[in-house]
């Protein structure tokens, strides 16, 4: 994860693992339970349990919609890189370009290319989801998941034998508690965001898949398997990225998309011809991981309309709604495709950042009696242009002063969609669901559904404490950290 590149080493891993056990497992068991008990997707499922919580189901549909508004774009970029390395293997293209940074910059600034690859990735998702869970998603995963593990192992072994790789392992697993003591909330919100995103929690996916879970299946066993396997894959991915960066870049890396599309391409370029093969395997496994996640999110949105139609006695219309949902999301992907991943219009991109487009640059300073030290103030002219005051400007009573809020809210469209979904809706949804199970529906609902399969429910006290206290309180801290970090 790029997140662990920022909040480093075991401080991040430790918090992630604790959250996965105390929050992730409990939330997943809860979502599986709700899905299987009702046999419905989020909106219909929450409505069946209690009409008062129907809105929580709608929130669980909006969340994956927002995630896909940037995830589809990243998936398209991964496809482009995987195919680029494939053509390089056969000598059809020189993918290891001389100036990788320039290529990455020109690619993300090329709106046409970004839109094209996003559209192709979306089309693949729509085709699989339109085929249904059994015929589409399950068949893909039966082939894709084993292939993912095989490619992971191949690249891990190759990277492990490179000189300098040990530095990457020390970086990942070496003990460092400084971030925990200096900035615990940032580590917490970063690890929580990664956990929710990686486990697809708080966005209806596990409720939807739970609705397909057979009664004979053990809910707890399935939840444990998902949490363990997902965490294992995440650690294995880190065992590729960080050792590779230390072996070939001396530990210097980017973060966010730059780590995946810039630092790793530089790594493969330094491998020579073998880098084409390793690059193809690496981006192929990222592609498999990406499309398996994006399909599950598109399924949440599609199944919402399918369930609605079935309840009204109409034909399910799965194919129609999968394609319709994909087309609508494609429109909302356009800002992510066209803002140059944060370059904005000032940097030559087609569209500006959210602060520009949504008019969030300026806010009145409010009722102040003097200038605050270290704060820049602006006045608005008759022409609508904001002018920054000089450092020695005198305060004028009754004058309206403005603050440039873009200095704090300066993320790109990817960050904006991510903040709304991963930053707010996911932890909020998990917090409310856990509270409802712990205090309203009670742990008995979960126990009864889990034991309906003939498997004894284990850890009743543990799960009850998680639902009543640990998850709601923990997610409240995460929400606070997410919002305060994004808005400055």
Regions found by a protein language model. Name each.
Residues 2-7:
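Short, small-residue-biased leader/transition segments that mark boundaries at the very start
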Residues 8-9, 29-56, 82-100, 135, ...:
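Flexible loop linkers connecting adjacent transmembrane helices
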Residues 31, 158-172, 233-261, 328-373, ...:
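Extracellular/periplasmic helix-exit of transmembrane alpha-helices
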Residues 71-94, 149-175, 246-247, 336-340, ...:
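Hydrophobic alpha-helical segments and their helix-loop junctions in multi-pass secondary transporters
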Residues 74-85, 117-158:
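Membrane-interface loop-to-helix entry segments
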Residues 115-116, 229-235, 279, 288-291, ...:
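Loop-to-transmembrane helix boundary motifs in multi-pass membrane proteins
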Residues 138, 142-295, 306-324:
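Membrane-embedded translocation segments of transport machinery
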Residues 301-302, 309, 313-326, 413-475:
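C-terminal membrane-solvent junction of multi-pass transporters and transport-like membrane proteins
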């Amino acid at each position: 994860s790029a997140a662990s590149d920022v909040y480093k080493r075991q401080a991040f891993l430790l918090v992630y693992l604790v959250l996965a056990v105390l929050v992730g497992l409990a939330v997943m068991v809860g979502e599986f339970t709700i899905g299987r008990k009702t046999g419905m997707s989020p909106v219909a499922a929450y409505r069946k349990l209690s009409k008062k919580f129907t809105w929580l189901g709608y929130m669980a549909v909006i969340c994956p919609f927002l995630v896909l508004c940037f995830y589809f774009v990243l998936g398209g970029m991964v496809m482009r890189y995987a195919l680029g390395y494939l053509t390089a293997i056969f000598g059809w293209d020189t993918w290891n370009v001389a100036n990788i940074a320039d290529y990455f910059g020109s690619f993300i600034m090329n709106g046409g290319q970004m839109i094209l690859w996003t559209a192709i990735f979306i089309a693949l998702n729509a085709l699989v989801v339109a085929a249904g869970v059994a015929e589409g998603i399950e068949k893909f995963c039966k082939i894709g998941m084993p292939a993912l593990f095989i490619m992971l192992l191949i690249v891990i072994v190759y990277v492990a034998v490179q000189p300098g790789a040990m530095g990457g392992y020390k970086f990942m697993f070496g003990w460092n508690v400084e971030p925990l003591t200096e900035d615990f909330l940032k580590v917490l919100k970063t690890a929580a965001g990664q956990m929710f995103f990686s486990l697809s929690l708080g966005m209806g996916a596990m409720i939807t898949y739970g609705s397909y879970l057979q009664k004979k299946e053990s809910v707890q066993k399935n939840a444990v398997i998902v949490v363990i396997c997902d965490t294992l894959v995440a650690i294995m991915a880190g065992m590729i990225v960080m050792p590779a960066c230390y072996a070939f870049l001396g530990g210097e890396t980017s973060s966010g998309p730059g780590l995946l599309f810039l630092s790793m391409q530089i790594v493969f370029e330094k491998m020579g011809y073998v880098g084409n093969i390793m690059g193809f395997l690496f981006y192929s496994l990222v592609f498999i991981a990406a499309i398996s996640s994006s399909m599950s999110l598109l399924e949440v949105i599609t199944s919402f309309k399918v369930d609605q139609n079935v309840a009204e006695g109409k034909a399910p219309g799965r194919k129609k709604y999968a394609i319709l949902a994909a087309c609508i999301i494609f429109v909302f992907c356009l800002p992510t495709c066209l803002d140059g991943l944060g370059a904005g219009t000032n940097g030559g991109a087609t569209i500006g950042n959210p602060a520009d487009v949504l008019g969030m640059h300026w806010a009145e300073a409010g009722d102040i009696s003097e200038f605050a030290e270290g704060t820049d103030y602006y006045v608005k002219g008759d022409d609508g242009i904001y002018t920054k005051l000089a450092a020695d400007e005198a305060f004028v009573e009754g004058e309206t002063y403005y603050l440039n809020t873009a200095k704090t809210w300066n993320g790109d469209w990817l960050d904006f969609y991510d903040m709304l979904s991963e930053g707010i809706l996911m932890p909020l949804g998990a917090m409310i669901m856990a509270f409802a199970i712990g205090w309203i529906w009670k742990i008995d609902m979960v126990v009864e559904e889990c034991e309906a399969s003939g498997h004894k429910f284990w850890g009743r006290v543990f799960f009850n404490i998680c639902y009543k206290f640990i998850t709601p309180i923990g997610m409240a801290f995460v929400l606070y950290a997410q919002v305060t970090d994004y808005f400055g």
